[in-house]
Amino acid sequence: MNLQKINDEVFIAQDAIVKIGGGELAFLKDQARTNLRKRARICAHKSNDDALHEMLIAISAQSYIHPHKHLGKSESFHIVDGVVDVVVFDDRGEITEIIELGDARSGRNFFYRLSESAFHTLLIRTDFLVVHEVTNGPFLRDKTVLADFAPAEAQTVEAAEYIRQVAARAAAFMKHGN
């Protein structure tokens, strides 16, 4: 596959027919291991302006996904490899739902679609998560809202502690079913 490197995290597939297999998964995981934010993606769409965005994304369990929401967008995940809990929050940072996902071998659901704008983050339960994400374009940075109830990505110590707290809250949420 011909890839155009945009930066250490983003690669654009240049072929008219995009095919992704084990070699590309290994490539993405290697890229994610070595970059600062511990994630990497291959975009099947060619431009931020495309109406449909499809990405294969490898995310290390060491990566902090700042709780965020996308205004006016839907997104779906199909889990290719790994296990994750998608934690959904209200605007105050209270957990409203946990979506337990995994690849087909895991016994968990392997697909979800978030049709309405809601804050969410990922608790990755395996060393790596590989997802096929689909969302509507265009990508406009100002349509992604970062939750003010969570630390910024640059606050690495606080972010790590926050994720530990979210994991504990998520466990209690799942235990009590609320």
Language-model-derived ranges and their functions:
Residues M1-L52, E97-A104, A159-N178:
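A short, N-terminal "cap"/entry segment at the start of jelly-roll beta-barrel domains
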Residues K38, L56-K73, E116:
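Conserved short histidine dyad/triad with adjacent acidic residue
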Residues D49-D50, G72, D127:
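Short strand-connecting beta-turns/loops that link adjacent beta-strands
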Residues D49-L52, S60-Y64, V83-D85, R92-E94:
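Short, charged/polar surface micro-motifs in flexible loops or helix N-caps
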Residues H66-H68, V86-V88, Y112-L114, H120-R125, ...:
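Short beta-strand His + acidic residue motifs that chelate non-heme Fe in jelly-roll/DSBH
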Residues G72-R92:
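Glycine- and acidic-residue-biased ligand/ion/polar-headgroup-sensing regions
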Residues S76, D90-H120:
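Short acidic-glycine-tyrosine-enriched beta hairpin
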Residues T96-I98, A104-S106, T121-N178:
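Double-stranded beta-helix
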